[in-house]
Amino acid sequence: GDLVEFGNTAKVLGDPDHPYTRSLISAVPRSDVKLDRFPLVSYIEEAHEMEPLDVKNHWLGQSQDHRDYTGSLLTVENVNLRFTTKDSLFESRREYVQASNNVSFEVFEGETFGLVGESGSGKSTIARVIAGLYQPNSGKVTFEGIDLTSLKSEKERRPLRRQMQMVFQNPYTSMNPRMKIFDIIAEPIRFHKLTRNENETRQIVHDLLDHVGLGKMAGVKYPHEFSGGQRQRISIARALATRPRLLICDEPTSALDVSVQAQILNLLKDLQDELNLTMLFISHDLPVIRQMCDRIGVMQMGTLLEVSPTEQLFTAPQHEYSKQLISLMPEFKGMSQEGLKLA
């Protein structure tokens, strides 16, 4: 509740006096260079790292029954999806919006593939198609060589659904407010029958809570008792509970301030390194995308315009729309004696 600093905008952002202000500014994602980790903001209660686990000998690190498939882990091929905006008995009178237009890309095991674009570009729609929440009008989604769009029964889909989990933009709306955190995380474990007994489930949930930096005592609380950043940690713990191979992160930090965002993004980086996770990372925030992704796809109005390695996209974009996006990106170069540098 204390006002630690105030003054001219250029002075406060370019040459701050208070350590907290400096720390807060350092947490803003860099757009000019890629860093291994995001600087954390000190002076706040949530600024801590996750508890380390020996994942090689831990349940989280145990491999699932993977098929012998050497191609890309995920392939999206010519996916089209349209939504009806005006229905009618007559086809000629129906109106549609094209949410996805012949979208195709591959995601390789262990990489982070980013989808970026303005609001309404169709990037979240593609994520939901991959997760099986939407059925495309045409095209297919292949996971380890299996066409997910051809699977009709729940019995066929369940083993593959376990290997793909989503982290949503708003963690609070993805949780049952009447359930305790322990049961929220344990729910997918019980649903997929991944443990032999409840004692084993309890140990796994406690380990997951420790691993995302909350501690096992968080399990006895309800979602409303946590901050936005803490709830996102809970969402990540729940997503990890099935030991997925693919983590779909749909704007996971867009509702968080930069201090908490840095913690969550570092957590995702650590989890990917330790568990060899493959990630599909969706965001409209170009600096965040640059820091997180190995390759990036640019979407506009349901169409995938370009797929490039991260550094190539930011230094030599190919499509005119990509060039426009990069040119409009605010470039905050941080603290200097000359003051704020915004391009």
What are these regions (language model features)?
Residues 9-75, 86-91, 310-343:
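Short catalytic/signature loops enriched in Gly
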Residues 131:
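Helix-to-loop junction immediately C-terminal to a conserved catalytic motif
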Residues 139-147, 160:
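Conserved ABC transporter NBD signature motif
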Residues 147, 199-217, 326-327:
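Conserved ABC ATPase "signature" region
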Residues 243:
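Conserved catalytic motifs of ABC-family nucleotide-binding domains
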Residues 289-291:
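A short, surface-exposed alpha-helical micro-motif characterized by mixed small hydrophobic
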